[in-house]
From Swiss-Prot:
Gene label: tsaD
Gene Ontology terms, MF aspect: iron ion binding; N(6)-L-threonylcarbamoyladenine synthase activity
NCBIfam families noted in UniProt: gcp_kae1 (TIGR00329), T6A_TsaD_YgjD (TIGR03723)
Binding positions for substrate per the UniProt entry: L138, V139, S140, G141, G142, D171, G184, N277
PROSITE patterns in UniProt: GLYCOPROTEASE
Protein name from the UniProt record: tRNA N6-adenosine threonylcarbamoyltransferase
Organism: Variovorax paradoxus (strain S110)
Function field: Required for the formation of a threonylcarbamoyl group on adenosine at position 37 (t(6)A37) in tRNAs that read codons beginning with adenine. Is involved in the transfer of the threonylcarbamoyl moiety of threonylcarbamoyl-AMP (TC-AMP) to the N6 group of A37, together with TsaE and TsaB. TsaD likely plays a direct catalytic role in this reaction.
Amino acid sequence: MLLLGIESSCDETGVALVETHGSALPQLRSHALHSQIAMHQAYGGVVPELASRDHIRRVLPLTEAVMAEAGRSLAEIDVVAYTRGPGLAGALLVGAGVACALGAALGKPVLGVHHLEGHLLSPFLSADPPEFPFVALLVSGGHTQLMRVDGVGRYELLGETIDDAAGEAFDKSAKLMGLPYPGGPWLAKLAEAGNPAAFKLPRPLLHSGDLDFSFAGLKTAVLTQAKKLGAELEANKADLAASTQAAIVEVLLKKSLAALGQTGLKRLVVAGGVGANRSLREQLNAACAKRGVRVHYPELHLCTDNGAMIAMAAAMRLQSGLAEASERYAFDVKPRWPMASLMASSAAPVAA
């Protein structure tokens, strides 16, 4: 079975081709991605209308490129998958519209996919895919969650952010320091030259006893420190960046280790854009190695939003019998779509 996946939830247009054979793990045949970062930099953030228009310009050329790279024709596609939500409404509608139009033109079914499930299952595209069950740290610009994952569609929420996500903490703190958009990668790069112990910043909910997160207070503390530094901010910017990153990473690390201890599982999956952060990876790898825990990540270029994860999630759902592709082309999107709606709380846990 050949699946085309289309991602257009925010500021990346992604298209990919995944192939399945029976119950074997789906294989990525080709993918293409266009980032809108350069376009949005002038505005200091994503402009939804511009994002939608750019998706319209990019999605069909990317589809043609993906098919050419794989040496396949559109007629060979069996299912067209697309990001149904969550995300920017206009951006989602572009991908959904193109997917449904392609499906109707080819006489092939379509399947809407949850964006976060795409991230969650993206490590299965790596050379070292995980095995169920595992603890998942889903950490991105808009979401921070810890889950127990016993199989496709068998998710138990262990904890989540009660305010800002970790990615927001990176991006908003970077903006307070005057760093360019997107702030997270710039802050991480600057932090390499700084002292992570230079400023004492809060680690919200670090000792709360549960697995929830909170990063709004950290953002406020960074703002307070930046104002306090005043004209000295530029000279101390690397130290402030390093201290901010250290606070975020410590919380993610300690909560992840607590989740592993609580579940007794020995596998951790880290997915989402923040999963590309080098400091987070290094500290998780070191701490988990001491505990005999295997850590799995997506390939670095697949940490960001991409079509491969959408095609993969669709393929794995179809293989698991949890979804049926539809030839009903009257689509709808879900800009707000809680991951909890996919969680089968009644499913019995799988032994580690």
